[in-house]
Design a protein with these regions (language model features):
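Intrinsically disordered, low-complexity terminal regulatory regions
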Residues: 1-67
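Short loop/turn motifs at secondary-structure junctions and domain boundaries
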Residues: 40, 99-105
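Regulatory sensory and allosteric helical modules in signal-transduction proteins
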Residues: 51-101, 129
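A short, aliphatic-rich beta-strand micro-motif
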Residues: 106-114
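Juxtadomain coupling helices with adjacent low-complexity linkers
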Residues: 2-5, 9, 13, 17-21, ...
């Protein structure tokens, strides 16, 4: 498996966006989850959390494991939601407050928007970068 080379990663995102655009009329969070999860072999979790009172609850996901839900606001997702900033965690074992739902998760990216957080975990260390950030923001804008 291993990390994707930047040019392959860009190409994969472009294909994913094309597929998602073709589904625009019936676009749902489940379709986005399934489309992207299927295209990136390293990912072991792709999901959307929604803010409910003082916690985040899973709304839609595709995963190797059942997700943790609800989760507190101290983990990566909660910090991303509260700061309204994208967070890239190269090594989740070194992130204070990381909530471990799957022991195979090695790195993570979170993208907050509206009352939600997109959370993606990878089996590879340092798997997320500016390419992921760029294309995931584009996908969020399509919702």
């Amino acid at each position: 498996m291993g990390k994707l080379q930047p040019d392959i990663k860009e190409e994969t995102y472009q294909k994913a966006i094309s597929k998602i655009k073709n589904l625009k009329d019936e676009l749902t969070l489940d379709l986005i989850c399934n489309t992207l999860y299927d295209m990136f072999e390293n990912w072991n979790f792709f999901g959307f959390y929604v803010k409910k009172t003082n916690e985040l609850e899973i709304l839609s996901y595709t995963s190797d494991q059942i997700p943790c839900s609800p989760i507190n606001m101290n983990g990566v997702c909660g910090q991303s939601f509260n700061s309204k900033k994208i967070i890239i965690v190269p090594d989740v074992s070194k992130f204070h407050g990381h909530i471990e739902c799957d022991p195979n998760s090695k790195s993570e990216i979170t993208i907050p928007f509206l009352n939600y957080v997109l959370d993606i975990d990878s089996r590879e260390l340092d798997d997320f970068d500016k390419i992921d950030k760029k294309y995931l923001k584009k996908i969020i804008e399509m919702i």
